[in-house]
Amino acid sequence: MNKGKHHARSFHPPSVADVDQLKEHAGIAACKFVEDGMAIGLGTGSTVRFSIIEIARMINLEGIEIVGVPTSESTRRLAESLGIRLMSLEEVGKLNLTIDGAD
């Protein structure tokens, strides 16, 4: 081994496809906390989009019932288009869980 000689590791940022896949995994993983009967705050962003799609799948295939409270108009439109029942925060009163991202 050559002492004093450092081999620099090159850093390669993840590709857009890799980032999208990581966001999908994170969005789906967040849904592991979703339970039947919950009122769920639905955030906004590219990662939460995957969560909303997963929640719709859970409603349709697993038969869970939840109420979503969207944080934006775009989230409302997506959730409605996927058949997620929505209410306002005033109607729900208290959220059991909120799913949001950092983007």
Regions found by a protein language model. Give the residues of each.
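N-terminal active-site beta-alpha-beta segment that forms phosphate/nucleotide-binding
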Residues: H7-A102
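N-terminal nucleotide-binding beta1-loop-alpha1 segment
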Residues: N2-H6
